[in-house]
């Protein structure tokens, strides 16, 4: 695999699809006028071949080639399991 692919740590918010999941990660953006840092959430669709992740898990994902119209990230592994 290419060494300059992006990897992220995200929280799983939905896994109701087959071989897919929706994850969300937060980033902080500085307001252009007031200078306050604002929390922004980004949702991504990921490819989970074996349906390993569950809602609430912290997972590692990697950018890849486009798999479908909305999926361009793939599941790497579970970092922390959900408490349920």
Swiss-Prot record:
| Cited CDD domains | Ribosomal_uS17
The answer to keyword Ribonucleoprotein applying to this record is yes
Instruction: Return one GO MF term.
Output: rRNA binding
From its record, what is one biological process in GO terms? translation
What the entry lists under InterPro entries is as follows: NA-bd_OB-fold, Ribosomal_uS17, Ribosomal_uS17_bact/chlr, Ribosomal_uS17_CS
Protein family per UniProt: Belongs to the universal ribosomal protein uS17 family.
Q: Entry's NCBIfam families?
A: PRK05610.1 (NF004123), uS17_bact (TIGR03635)
- Stated role: One of the primary rRNA binding proteins, it binds specifically to the 5'-end of 16S ribosomal RNA.
- Please report the name of this protein according to its UniProt entry: Small ribosomal subunit protein uS17
């Amino acid at each position: 695999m290419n060494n300059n692919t992006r990897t992220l740590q995200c929280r799983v918010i939905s896994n109701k699809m087959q071989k897919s999941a929706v994850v969300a990660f937060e980033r902080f953006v500085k307001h252009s006028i007031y200078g306050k840092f604002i929390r922004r959430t980004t949702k991504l669709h990921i490819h989970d071949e074996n349906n390993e992740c569950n809602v609430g898990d912290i997972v590692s994902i990697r950018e890849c080639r486009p798999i479908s119209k909305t999926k361009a990230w793939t599941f790497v592994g579970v970092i922390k399991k959900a408490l349920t």
